Amino acid sequence: MSLQGIHLSDLSYKHAILKESQYTIKRDVGTTTAVTPSSLQQEITLLCGEILYAKHADYKYAAEIGIQYISTALGSERVQQILRNSGSEVQVVLTRTYSLGKVKNNKGEDLQMLDIHGVEKSWVEEIDKEARKTMATLLKESSGNIPQNQRPSAPDTPIILLCVGALIFTKLASTIEVGLETTVRRANRVLSDALKRYPRMDIPKIARSFYDLFEQKVYYRSLFIEYGKALGSSSTGSKAESLFVNIFMQAYGAGQTMLRWGVIARSSNNIMLGHVSVQAELKQVTEVYDLVREMGPESGLLHLRQSPKAGLLSLANCPNFASVVLGNASGLGIIGMYRGRVPNTELFSAAESYAKSLKESNKINFSSLGLTDEEKEAAEHFLNVSDDSQNDYE
């Protein structure tokens, strides 16, 4: 593997080719998917809460239910427009309700269940049944004193569910084993408050459901991105919504999901960003910022204007080709040596070779990387840069 052929000058040519396209690609022709109207948001919210509230045997549709909440939040017409804009020709089937007949709710009315296209009715019924059984048991144990925010009907349960989706969304470029392991570890930390409220929430199985869904229904990624941007632009929101936006913007802004070509950013932007992360020359950084301004928030690179170093350090541990370029900081010793581990030996070897060739041609500009003294010392030691020659690289 070699990085020598990647040059920033390729950017304008590649970007021009992409801009000149007069055509769009049609995908998912003949496929169907569920869309839930806003009028059923309360029912979807309750189903999300029931998924979190009890321990279930099967979570395979958990992610689909979370996406259906997004559908109710954006509105069915906007959802269809987002899917069309993403190039998807998938046909939508509106969610409906049906009566279970003999089963009554606590008001003595026929219990209404959701009929969601592609989701087995028996699965929905079993989720509801298990949640009600758990609720009955806990009511007896607590003499009826279950706080509202620990019940399945709590209004923020869909957002908690989607937080797991946002965590797995940042790992779509990883292998499933690495992605799930990292997601579960992070979720146990960032969702600690939610886990106290819903201790039976099965994060590993919910995360697996989201991973599988984003792989099977790629068009849902566009829907997820638009929802995250819409929620992030809202002036008010709950604590759970703020947490979701924070997780989402780390994925959208820090560039981890950009590594999945076609998800957020064009491949040419990935190459450009990676080249700057290696050479970090002021002229090239300026070119990056100019492109960011031109493309606006759609570029997903705006975080670089505020925190260039954070952007570099967040892009080093992903397993595909684009990350070889983006992860060149590991070749400087900032990631691979500074953390004392090598997550990808092939990536590290290529980055090491490239970084040393840049050192020999005096192209590494440490000052524009904004390193801490400890990081800078690690990089200089790794590249054998002496104090006498240090100025050659600054």
From Swiss-Prot:
One of its GO terms (cellular component) is host cell cytoplasm. It is found in: Virion; Host cytoplasm. It comes from the Viruses. Keywords: Capsid protein, Helical capsid protein, Host cytoplasm, Ribonucleoprotein, RNA-binding, Viral nucleoprotein, Virion. It holds the Pfam family Pneumo_ncap. InterPro entries: Pneumo_ncap. One of its GO terms (molecular function) is RNA binding. Its main location: virion. Encapsidates the viral RNA genome by forming a left-handed helical nucleocapsid that protects the RNA from nucleases. RNA replication depends on the availability of soluble nucleoprotein. The encapsidated genomic RNA is termed the NC and serves as template for transcription and replication. Homomultimerizes to form the nucleocapsid. Binds to viral genomic RNA. Interacts with the phosphoprotein P. When in a monomeric RNA-free form, interacts with the phosphoprotein (via N-terminus). Interacts with protein M2-1; this interaction allows the association of nucleocapsid with the matrix protein. Belongs to the paramyxoviruses nucleocapsid family. This is Nucleoprotein.
